Regions:
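Short aromatic/hydrophobic "clamp" motif used to bind/position activated sugar donors
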Residues: 43
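Conserved nucleotide-sugar donor-binding
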Residues: 39-40, 104-118
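Short beta-strand/loop segment that forms part of the nucleotide-sugar
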Residues: 1-4, 21-23
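A short, conserved alpha-helix in the catalytic core of glycosyltransferases
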Residues: 113-117, 123-141, 145
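A conserved acidic beta->alpha catalytic loop
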Residues: 2-10, 50-51
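Glycine-rich, basic loop-to-helix element that forms the pyrophosphate-binding segment
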Residues: 12, 22-38
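Conserved donor NDP-sugar-binding/catalytic core segment of glycosyltransferases
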Residues: 54-83
Length: 172
């Protein structure tokens, strides 16, 4: 779902054969609009700056056999920097031990489980942590990696961006 982008996103996606859903700004609302428009038994929710790696779908079907589990990916950033590896490792540890994956780790969830937790929240930010909170005990990490663009971290700095993320979580 597009939340009012001003670049060529919609044009490029349309030319590639994608169906574009227009929604309001804010990830939660965009995700909700996409889910409503799509329908289906399972949803794979990804941020626009995330990339599935080659071979991701090999054997993927076995994870669709249990509607009571929502899955997220191991995170890796698109940067060779040491801080990219440190930040990605921390995100994976945080997700595993605290059950708090962020949206940049993706989410594979059955429609049945999504409905059982009253759907996705339309909040603009922290929709990922809100969903993780409601899915407590029903989340598991896939043995697959999702590549997320490191541009935001590299622009602001790994420590500053990380500190801002922690501050947002604390305020939430």
């Amino acid at each position: 779902s597009d939340g009012g982008s001003y670049d060529q996103t919609c044009k490029i996606a349309s030319e590639a054969g994608c169906h574009i859903v227009q929604g309001k700004c804010g990830r939660g609302g965009q995700i909700c609009e996409g889910l409503i428009e799509t329908g289906g038994d399972w949803f794979l929710i990804l941020h626009a700056d995330s990339e599935l790696l080659h071979g991701w779908s090999d054997g993927f079907g076995k994870y669709l056999s249990d509607n009571s589990i929502a899955w997220y990916f191991r995170l890796r950033f698109s940067s060779p920097a040491l801080m990219a590896r440190v930040t990605g490792t921390w995100a994976n540890v945080r997700s595993s031990y605290f059950g708090a994956p962020y949206g940049d780790q993706g989410l594979l969830i059955s429609n049945e489980l999504l409905n059982s937790v009253n759907g996705y929240s339309r909040i603009a930010l922290m929709e990922d942590l809100e969903m993780a909170r409601r899915l407590k005990g029903s989340l598991a990490m896939l043995p697959l990696t999702l590549l997320t663009d490191a541009q935001r971290y590299e622009k602001k700095g790994w420590v500053i961006q990380g500190a801002q993320n922690i501050w947002r979580v604390v305020r939430y």
